[in-house]
Each structure stands twice: as C-alpha cells, then as structure tokens.
C-alpha cells in the first residue's frame, strides 16, 4: 500500500471534516464525552467516517481527540484510554478499508488535552498534579493504542500550547520506537486571534521552532 508521504508528493490529499459537530447533528444521546463513542457507538462513528469518504475525503481522523488520561480524568475514564484509541482506530480503519475504488488513510487524532503546561507552569498551583511527564505518559498510552488499532499516521491537532505539543511528539516517538513503526506525524495549531498566536502566547514561528526537530510530515 502506498505510504501517505509518497502520495502527498504527487497530489493534494483531502482531510475529513469535523467529528464533534457531525455527532451533534445526528442527535445521539450520550454524556458529551465524544472519545468514549468508539466503545459505545462504533456503528455511528463508522457511518460518519464513511460519509466523509463518500464526500471525497482521502484521510479520515479517528474519534480520539481527547482520549488521553488527562482529558478523561473528569469523566472518570482515564483507565479506558488505551481501549478508546484501539477502538477508534479500528473503526476508522474498517471504514477506510471498505472504500474499494481508492486508498483512504487513517490518521490518529491527538488533541491538546484540557490542560496547558505553559499556563500551569506560570501559575505554580500546588494543587495541580499535571506535569510534562504526566501528560507525556498519557499521550504515550494514546499513541500505543492508535498504533495497535491500525492508524497510518498521527495528527497532533489544534495545538494550543507548544509544551503540550512537545509532550505529544515525544510520546509518539517513544511509542513508535517501542512498536517498531515509522508512521508520519502532522501537526495543526489553533490561532486565538488577530495576533496570530496560539492560546499559550506563542507565535507560529515560536511553535515551529519548538517542534521542527520532530521530522513532521506537515505543520
């Protein structure tokens, strides 16, 4: 099968659209934790992936944006994160493989989590338990689940803090080393306002500077 990196040299690849907004449109009743849906509503997610593929997407992203132990803490589901990621990847893979007329790739979605390491480090709150190592460990479990579920690569999505992004990229590298894989990684950032900065106050140039050594497929 063609590596996504090779395909990108030849043509522009089309990513899918929003997952959360589509789930809301379908009116599924659930507790608001999108990342548990691979375990509870796999059929719904498969349908969404297939709808995007039928609309022309070359790449579908797993429904695992917040499937890390830090983000899942509030839902009491931190211990299910590995399973969420395996299931999320398997569902997207099944949808991608059902497309017989062309190749569709699966990217494992890893969001910024609901914590900002830069802000935590500035606040120095003695009650705060999330550190760089805690977040990196959470991303490590997520990345291993995505690899085991069969992704073609990773998308570190809507980065809001360069420190968080480095934690995710470090974890992906460690997971790939352990699993013996060399899957591509892409990164996207969320710009807050006209200043062109991300939430933690970094410019895109500063963010790029902090992640450029990670051999990203795209930024």
Regions found by a protein language model. Give the residues of each.
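Domain-level signal for soluble alpha/beta catalytic cores
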Residues: 1-218
């Amino acid at each position: 099968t063609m590596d996504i990196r090779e395909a990108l040299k030849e043509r522009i690849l089309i990513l899918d659209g929003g997952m959360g907004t589509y789930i809301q449109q379908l009116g599924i009743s659930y507790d608001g934790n999108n990342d548990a849906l691979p375990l509870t509503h796999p059929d719904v997610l498969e349908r969404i992936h297939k709808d995007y593929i039928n609309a022309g997407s070359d790449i579908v992203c797993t429904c695992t944006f917040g499937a890390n132990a830090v983000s899942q803490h509030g839902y009491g589901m931190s211990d299910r994160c590995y399973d969420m990621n395996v299931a999320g990847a398997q569902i997207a893979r099944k949808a991608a493989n059902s497309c017989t007329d062309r190749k569709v790739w699966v990217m494992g979605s890893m969001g910024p989590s609901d914590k900002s390491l830069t802000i935590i480090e500035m606040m120095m709150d003695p009650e705060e338990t999330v550190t760089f190592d805690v977040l990196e460990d959470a991303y490590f479990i997520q990345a291993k689940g995505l690899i085991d579920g069969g992704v073609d690569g990773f998308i570190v999505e809507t980065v809001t803090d360069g420190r968080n992004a480095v934690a995710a990229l470090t974890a992906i590298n460690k997971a790939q080393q352990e699993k013996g894989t060399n899957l591509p990684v892409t990164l996207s950032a969320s710009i807050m306002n006209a200043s062109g900065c991300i939430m933690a106050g970094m410019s895109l140039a500063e963010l790029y500077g902090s992640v450029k050594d990670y051999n990203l497929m795209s930024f």
